[in-house]
């Protein structure tokens, strides 16, 4: 037994003093966790949240182009030229429009703007225009310009929509008037006109002389004849009659002709569309701020490089894709396995099987070594850089896969188009659900691939070292190699950088292996001898026990008798 103990201690002494090199990976005190398809809450050294949840809370310039806030005027009040909105008449360019939903100055005369939602949608795609006079009021003939107390200007004087002319009788006459606008601007032109529907026939005759006037509007492709629909309607601003305002986009080279003998709101100013683009009309009471953003929502600007956002589906600009999720983390580091505090005999270094290394700097994978000069640790920058490139490609691929052509139209329509709004809502919700599901599934798959990639990279590095060392080392099975020769720091560096020459140390390694194998054989021989002795003694004890048991049984049954003679 003494020989066995001595042999074992000798083997331990050889192992402890051997030079060693280990392959391992980084571990940190990170609390980051990600989900995969097969597992939730996997600890990782690092991750990024792909969903942006923060915004500026203000309206900002979009990519350097300022928005326009309509102030106290609604979109309709601005377009038709409410006299209280003259400060907005100089607007020419914007990145998007902001409308206060409670703006007091809309249509000052009771009525409506026909196809209001469609016009709003059109203006969502306009970046700049110029207001220009289409037909001078004096060119129509023997009619007068009408004004109303419902539409007062900033001085309190009766006025009317500045982009329209309300013609009434002159000298108790209202002849048939007619004019044509020919679009020679080379651009699309927005033309407005309207029809006044009086309370009664008497009011009709008072204003227009004719009891049943008409208005005819026609272009090359369509024609519309309007008749007055008299009747009392719910009103405001002291008026009970009604005005309906129409619009049309006249393309270059097209003409539009107007003919009327009463109830006609003639076009005066129109808008030359100078630039189309991608915009939006946000309805909010939030005012503008001096800031710049690349993505604007109804609640604030988003400045982020993240792939997704959960702030607003109606975002404008270079925006992350909207999904319904609070958090979506993509693994960018390794599976985080805490380091083992006390490794091996006398705190010896250990490889990746026994956990990560907290001291690894500037790399995800690397080497630890132990020799007569001490211990050292170094990152393998080449394999780390390859992994970083792979993850960068992953993130870019996710962005590319999630870039779709779908744009929400929600928010461009008013109360008149409730069915369109309902349909838009359903489409938005369905598409958002699909995007959200696809995004989550994609990230879960990529997290699985990332963690598998890191495991494979560590094993590849281990296999690379094993091929270099060949028979000059013993693979301990835990990510470490026990070198069978002396290996100083320079020697360790050749193993790390792939320039190690195993033939240089082959003879020394062969002798060391024979020495270790001899100690193992002698130890095993002593073990076998000890086992033989123990086996013999155990067998004898069992045999004696059996004989004594037989004798006691025989005596108790009367088959055995002792005679004592004196």
UniProtKB/Swiss-Prot annotation:
Signal peptide interval: 1-18
Protein name in UniProt: Hemagglutinin
Miscellaneous comment text of the record: Major glycoprotein, comprises over 80% of the envelope proteins present in virus particle.
Keywords: Clathrin- and caveolin-independent endocytosis of virus by host, Clathrin-mediated endocytosis of virus by host, Disulfide bond, Fusion of virus membrane with host endosomal membrane, Fusion of virus membrane with host membrane, Glycoprotein, Hemagglutinin, Host cell membrane, Host membrane, Host-virus interaction, Lipoprotein, Membrane, Palmitate, Signal, Transmembrane, Transmembrane helix, Viral attachment to host cell, Viral envelope protein, Viral penetration into host cytoplasm, Virion, Virus endocytosis by host, Virus entry into host cell
Protein topology in the membrane: Single-pass type I membrane protein
Example GO biological process: virion attachment to host cell
PTM (free text): Palmitoylated.
Compartment(s): Virion membrane; Host apical cell membrane
Site (described: Cleavage): 343-344
Residues modified by glycosylation: 29, 54, 182-183, 305, 488, 497
Main location: virion
Stored SUPFAM superfamilies: Influenza hemagglutinin (stalk), Viral protein domain
Domain of life where this protein originates: Viruses
Molecular function GO labels: host cell surface receptor binding
UniProt xrefs under Pfam families: Hemagglutinin (PF00509)
Topological domains annotated Cytoplasmic: 554-566
Family indicated by similarity: Belongs to the influenza viruses hemagglutinin family.
